[in-house]
From Swiss-Prot:
This is Transcription activator of gluconeogenesis ERT1. Residues 97-151, 222-239 have a biased composition (Polar residues). The keyword Ligase does not apply. Transcription factor which regulates nonfermentable carbon utilization. Activator of gluconeogenetic genes. It comes from Candida albicans (strain WO-1). Belongs to the ERT1/acuK family. One of its GO terms (molecular function) is zinc ion binding. Keywords: Activator, DNA-binding, Gluconeogenesis, Metal-binding, Nucleus, Transcription, Transcription regulation, Zinc.
Amino acid sequence: MKIKQENITNTTSINTSNVNDKPKPKRKKTSRACNHCHKAHMTCDSGRPCKRCIQRGLDSTCEDAPRKRKKYLQDVPNSSLMSNHSMNSSDNLDSNGVSPMQPTLSQPMPPVQESSLPTNIPNQSQVPSQSPNTASQKQLSYSPPLASTYSPNHKTYSATLFQHSATSPELMQTVPEYFPELYNQHYQPSANPNQKRRTNFLSTAADLEYSTLSNILQENFGHHTTSNEGTPNSHNFSPALSPHNMPTNNTNAPSTSTQLLTNDQQRQATSFNNHTKHNTPSPLNTSHTKLYEDARYPKCDETINQYFLGDTDSGKMVVFPDVLTAIENMKNNDPAVYLERNSKSALSFVMSIQHENNSNGGKEDQLFKEPEEIYEKVKKPFSYTPGYHSLIAYLRKRFTKPMLVKMAESMATYRPSFIACTNSLKEHDLIFMEQCFQRTLLTYDNYIKISGTPTIVWRRTGEVAYVGNEFCVLTGWPKEELIGKDKRKFIVELLDDKSVLQYFQVFSRIAFGDFLGATMTECTLLTPNPNVKIRTGCMWTLKRDVFGIPMMIVGNFLPIL
């Protein structure tokens, strides 16, 4: 009896435990927890406020927990990032790019707009009577997603919606005709530059970068466009429109460029374009009409205080020292004109140069045009000995003995290294060195012509071997005076005393010591006019040959205004 009673007791306890062990319904996990559940590591639901926060009395502060940013989004402000709710809403779009309307709004809408927006349209009977036909009634069987843009939290959602639907002609036809205010609001350029724009970028960071560029264009040109309208492929892109012709007061301007101009403005734009086709802009042929044509002073655009240098219409070369002299005379003789020009804008210069076919014309060892000419005509080495003798004679004639001692100390620094490198060279090596020099000079000639920087090239003895046209305009020295036939000009003849001493010190430092062979310094250039000296910033680049011996120095100069 005891055994049977124990079996009955065990069976009863097993049945009771089976009833109590029924699996509890699992909570459905949500893709994003609220801030309180996330902090407590608890399971959350998709509702806001969630059930757990309602039970704990935290429903007023229940919101989505912030997610950890990606590295490429560390510097992006929070206001520009796309919210998670808008990202999820864009995934729920149907095939036509339409999403159901949000059930609640974060802030109340204006009464007029609220009365004109139905909250739900389950069938055709709720369509207003002013719908034009049954076809449009059938298309209005969904709630317009445009109403969701009244909530600040859903602005990005509206932009994402139009990302899929802006180019769809079917959906464009389904826009409710009884929402004219909303239609104009979303399909015309907005007056608010901070309003989110529709975009073709799937990456928020890429869209943010492009939106920033669009905002810059809006601020500078007064033309409010969306991110799609700012692309070169859009219909609103009009390179013929200048920023001055664009409207700035009309915030609801039409999107096409033909509607931005009146008939008179269109004719003016057409005539301006035709004018620019036949008249190539140049320093001597500009659209400005206020050119100061006084014969006493150089040609100048007084609206921007800009003087013209180089070749002129009369065939006369205007050089920088002459302009400086004229400005000084204007300052002394016509102070009113001088003050008027400088009060408008800072002093500036523009240069017009016509490059000759032979940049070193007239000299026996002129610049070769082709590399084949170099290897055919260079049959003997270049003699540096006469150059050194002429350099020493010039230095003794110009400088005092204390300065000559300092120059000699600088030369003594690199003289032993130079003797050691050249002691073992044969005549064929010296011929090859000269071929390398001419070949390098031919390559640099192409660079110097297109750089526009005043440039001069000299040998290691200081003898000038090449002069750019811009350097002649800067200093006023004629090219025939520097590298003409039977002329030997040294770089030290173009520098003042302090700059010459600095030159030898710099050359001794970079000749064999500095492998890069480039340095930047400041020097003063002499001009044919003894009363005019030009303070410049310069960069000297030393070029070595295959034997490691200094071959040439390239000097670039820019005036310090």
